[in-house]
Regions:
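Membrane-interface transmembrane helices that cradle and orient dolichyl/undecaprenyl
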Residues: 142-156
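Start-transfer (signal-anchor) and selected internal transmembrane alpha helices
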Residues: 1-38
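Transmembrane-helix signature of polytopic, membrane-embedded enzymes
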Residues: 24-25, 104-123
Length: 164
């Protein structure tokens, strides 16, 4: 139900953004409000998503840096560090969500003249990244890295692609 409400909020914000130039401030409020709601939902969720238990079990049982499994090295390293420092899966979800939404919001603000509409498109394709997986983080970094192509900073773009 809440996904429908978020969709309606984004849809209304998109109409304001495109068709009512006097309400640009309202559209910005809707953009940041929706982004904040999606961010909160993405790391406060518990036992949601088809592969939640697999990720949770991996996090709970990581005691050394073993790069021989099917996860990316950066993801393994991040899991290990968060497990070692905080031993809290919620902290891991918070950090993953922060990475994802930082890069998504920066990319949308840089690339789009209609940020609410862009967030609506992102939400429609990924359910807002609420049930995020590693590929959404990579997608967010890649979307952000498009700015380096525009600015002709090829080495920064390649670095971002490698990180993603």
């Amino acid at each position: 139900m809440y996904l429908y409400l978020i969709f309606i909020l984004l849809l209304a914000g998109s109409f304001l953004e495109i068709f009512d130039s006097k309400r640009q401030g309202t559209a910005q409020i809707i953009y940041y409000l929706t982004l904040s709601i999606l961010f909160l939902l993405s790391f406060l969720r518990w036992e949601r998503g088809t592969d939640w238990s697999g990720y949770y079990d991996y996090f709970s049982n990581i005691y050394d840096l073993d790069f021989s499994n099917n996860f990316e090295n950066g993801f393994i390293f991040l899991n290990y560090c968060i497990h070692y420092l905080f031993n809290s899966y919620t902290v891991l979800l918070f950090i993953l969500a922060a990475i994802q939404y930082f890069f998504i919001s920066k990319a949308i603000r840089y690339l789009s003249i209609y940020p609410v509409l862009s967030l609506l498109c992102y939400f429609s394709v990924t359910k807002g990244g609420i049930f995020f997986v590693r590929q959404y983080i990579a997608l967010a970094i890649l979307m952000y890295s498009i700015r380096y192509v525009i600015e002709k900073k090829i080495y920064m773009f390649l670095f971002a692609v490698i990180i993603a």
